Regions:
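Solvent-exposed, amphipathic alpha-helical segments
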Residues: 20, 24-32, 78-82, 111, ...
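Hydrophobic/aromatic-rich alpha-helical bundle segments in the mid-to-C-terminal region
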Residues: 124-130, 134, 148-211
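Hydrophobic alpha-helical connector segments
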Residues: 66, 77-109, 161-165, 187, ...
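Amphipathic alpha-helical segments used for helix-helix packing
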Residues: 92, 105-126
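Short, basic, alpha-helical segments at the C-terminal edge of helix-turn-helix-like DNA-binding modules
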Residues: 69-74
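Helix-turn-helix
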Residues: 20, 24-62, 66
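Short coil/turn segments at alpha/beta junctions that flank glycine-rich nucleotide-binding fingerprints
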Residues: 31-35, 85, 150
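N-terminal intrinsically disordered/low-complexity leader segments
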Residues: 1-16, 205-211
Length: 211
């Protein structure tokens, strides 16, 4: 019995092929998680031979690390843009908490959770995780420092408070992956805790209405 013959892949420039492979890895990760980004899976997604993917991406661990970085950096840029135009640090912080804890970002949360676990054995991925955690902490710290400067927030250490807040967000979102608690509870629990951390009145960080 003859085996099916794969149709020869259309010729593309190196830049086009590299972008196609990166896009396929990105889609696989968001749909099925980082562990799904394998040589064979990427090749199947773009209908080429695994050898062609290996030619452009000889180190799949590097591809996994870059895929993680691109996904989480895009989310950071999106959240930063969402809150940047709001008039006060308090409103920016409230909007940040609302969008990060409303349950709409579970696909990216899965990426984070898998990256923390896989990064124990994959140093390139671990380095990327550390870089992106630093980037998130820096963004949150900037909002807190602006609030301290304007007199809205009270904290002697905005950097430490930013790490605490990031840990709360990450932990609650990770728990949500196994359907523990609902989005409303996660948001209110975090908001009330952060209000206490920053010397705010209860309800000061209630979710805003963004028009």
């Amino acid at each position: 019995m003859s085996s099916p013959t794969r149709k020869k892949a259309a010729r593309k420039s190196p830049a086009e092929r590299a972008a196609e492979i990166a896009d396929a890895a990105h889609e696989l990760a968001l749909e099925q998680g980082l562990a799904a980004v394998t040589l064979r899976a990427v090749a199947a997604r773009i209908d080429v031979a695994p050898a062609l993917v290996a030619h452009y991406e000889p180190d799949m661990q590097a591809l996994i690390a870059s895929t993680f970085a691109s996904i989480v950096a895009a989310e950071l840029a999106e959240v930063d843009a969402l809150v940047a135009g709001l008039p006060t640090p308090r409103k920016r912080l409230a909007a940040m908490l609302a969008t990060l804890l409303d349950g709409s970002r579970d696909d990216v949360t899965v990426i984070w959770v898998e990256a923390w676990a896989m990064g124990r054995r994959k140093e390139a991925l671990a380095a990327g995780v550390r870089d992106q955690m630093d980037a998130w902490q820096a963004m949150i710290r900037g909002v807190l420092e602006a609030g301290v400067a304007s007199g809205e927030f009270e904290t002697d250490d905005p950097a430490a408070a930013a790490w605490q807040l990031l840990g709360m967000i990450d932990g609650l979102n990770a728990q949500a992956l196994v359907r523990w608690g609902d989005a409303a509870d996660r948001g209110s629990l975090t908001s009330h805790a952060v209000e206490g951390m920053l010397g705010l009145e209860r309800g000061a960080l209630a979710p805003p209405v963004i028009e």
